[in-house]
Amino acid sequence: MAEETYAVLKTNLGDITVQLFPNHAPKTVRNFVELAEGTREWTDPKTGKPGSGPFYDGTIFHRIISGFMIQGGDPLGQGFGGPGYTFDDEIHPDLRFDKKYLLAMANAGLRGGKGTNGSQFFITVSTPAHLNGKHTIFGEVVDDASKKVVDEIGTVRTGAGDRPVQDVVLQSVTIERRQA
């Protein structure tokens, strides 16, 4: 039996369960899982010192664009923080932004020919085909209850910079390994 990997994103508006795609984006999934579990080294962007423990716990969804996506994974909550390192995209030809509720890496494009993925991610609430080939898709929201939570987050009131007026907190990310 094959093992499948899931992430449960516990937010203050409800839980989002996502199936991860390690066969399509192994480095990206490994990075996300290790940050979530606190087993990967990272640098605290506030202090410049080594961080410890689960990276995502207590962060916020700092950017929400209604009809497009919800974005989180920045420990600074401002859109430019990360784990202190970057890595390249893993664009898989079988994965395209052709349906809603896909989990992908947020990035700043290529810099010096290198990828800028770190810890920030987004979940789509539309089918943004213009992102194909630019962002690594590494998971998908799996159940209707989770999709409802994504939709609710996707419609919260926002202010300047698409930041929610009231924080949407990612309280924890739990990784589950299940037999298929």
Give residue ranges: language-model regions.
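Cyclophilin-like peptidyl-prolyl cis-trans isomerases
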Residues: 1-180
